[in-house]
Amino acid sequence: MFALREKYKNEIISQLKSELNMSNPMLLPKLEKIVISVGAGDYAKDSKIMQNIADTISLIAGQKAVITLAKKSVAGFKMREGMPMGVKVTLRGKMMYNFLEKLIVIALPRVKDFRGLKRNGFDGRGNYSFGLNEQLMFPEVVYDDIMVTHGMNITIVTSTHSDKEAFKLLELLGMPFAKGR
């Protein structure tokens, strides 16, 4: 499942060189990491559900997920220092390309009424973030094994600081952006 990585090396680099008018291949935008995170919300107090969420994200990512803990106590949110707040996993290298390929080819087409990802998810520094409503679109997730359905946030970090260059890179990689704005 290394087709996306090979496509980047063999095809996309040359396309980016010509479209962005860059002669130095080291200046071309590339993927640095993908961060998948889940905020626990009301489920933070139940350790079994938190572990189930972590196991589900680990299955999806192919890498062990980490339960994130609160750094400070905030009375307004009923949150204490050291309390579990969510789950995250950071993917780099082969695992990153495998996940992105699975997301583009398998998971996103399984979303009901999917019309493409919004283009306004760029942060002004070349990174793209979007959210998914549930985890059932991934083939590794078995409906009977999950305790709660939850969404997830996915952030794709690129080496460029330009949203235009990052958009071009993700578009060439096959990200299904919505038509129009």
Swiss-Prot record:
Function: This is one of the proteins that bind and probably mediate the attachment of the 5S RNA into the large ribosomal subunit, where it forms part of the central protuberance. In the 70S ribosome it contacts protein S13 of the 30S subunit (bridge B1b), connecting the 2 subunits; this bridge is implicated in subunit movement. Contacts the P site tRNA; the 5S rRNA and some of its associated proteins might help stabilize positioning of ribosome-bound tRNAs.
Keyword Secreted: no
Keywords in alphabetical order: Ribonucleoprotein, Ribosomal protein, RNA-binding, rRNA-binding, tRNA-binding
Gene: rplE
Biological process according to GO: translation
Name of the featured protein: Large ribosomal subunit protein uL5
NCBIfam families with a match to the protein in the record: PRK00010.1
Quaternary structure, from the entry: Part of the 50S ribosomal subunit; part of the 5S rRNA/L5/L18/L25 subcomplex. Contacts the 5S rRNA and the P site tRNA. Forms a bridge to the 30S subunit in the 70S ribosome.
Family under the similarity heading: Belongs to the universal ribosomal protein uL5 family.
Species in which this protein is naturally found: Helicobacter hepaticus (strain ATCC 51449 / 3B1)
GO cellular component assignments: ribonucleoprotein complex; ribosome
Superkingdom of origin organism: Bacteria
Keyword rRNA-binding found: yes
